[in-house]
Regions:
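A cross-family signal for N-terminal binding/gating loops and helix N-caps
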Residues: 1-187
Length: 187
């Protein structure tokens, strides 16, 4: 994306019907006094993992269940498990009972197939599940961006008001990406 706050802003004057071409950095000039803005302060997590099917084919898994909602159960020998929802690509290659492998310390067992690539799965892991995703996961970029994520994207695709204690989003609240710290301070 471009520089925060530099995007264009189209404003419609309701009284005159006139369209005004401006920039997002001038947003406050167009908001009526007393306007309430609601901000999604969740932090996007690197919830996309690249792994393999038992046959060796490449598979992609996007965790949809927020990590704080995972009900963890011990399996012994340091392993944990939890049921979750996620997207698997390619969905047609995921079969119920498959164990997708994402390293020696993370497996995803396919429990049920849903629509549009959504699956019910059981995660099996050792160690800290958040640390696994933070270290090896990929940031889920918007689908119109046709490239792999980079380290820089972890900052670019966060709002300036995203909070670490609100980590769990698997998609950036894109409307919020235009806000700058300066604009927030003026509010």
């Amino acid at each position: 994306p471009g520089e925060r706050g530099a995007s264009r802003l189209l404003v419609l004057d309701r009284e005159t019907g006139k369209r005004i071409h401006s920039h997002f950095s001038h947003l406050l000039e167009y908001l009526p006094k007393g306007t309430l803005l609601i901000a999604n302060n969740s932090r996007v997590v690197p919830a996309r993992m690249i792994g393999q099917r038992p046959s060796g084919g490449k598979m992609e898994f996007l965790l949809l269940t927020p990590m704080p909602l995972l009900e963890q159960h011990g399996e012994g020998d340091g392993w944990h498990c939890a049921e979750a929802d996620g997207l698997i690509k390619p969905a047609k290659n995921a079969r119920i009972g498959d164990h997708l492998v994402f390293g020696d310390d993370l497996r995803v067992e396919v429990l049920a197939k849903g629509e549009f690539g959504r699956h019910r799965v059981r995660l099996h892991w050792t160690g800290d599940i958040r640390a696994l995703f933070e270290s090896r996961g990929h940031l889920p970029l918007p689908p119109y961006i046709k490239r792999e994520d980079t380290k820089d994207d972890r900052g670019t695709y966060q709002t300036v008001y995203a909070r670490d204690d609100k980590a769990g989003s698997v998609a950036a609240p894109t409307a919020g990406l235009h806000f700058t710290p300066e604009l927030r301070a003026q509010m």
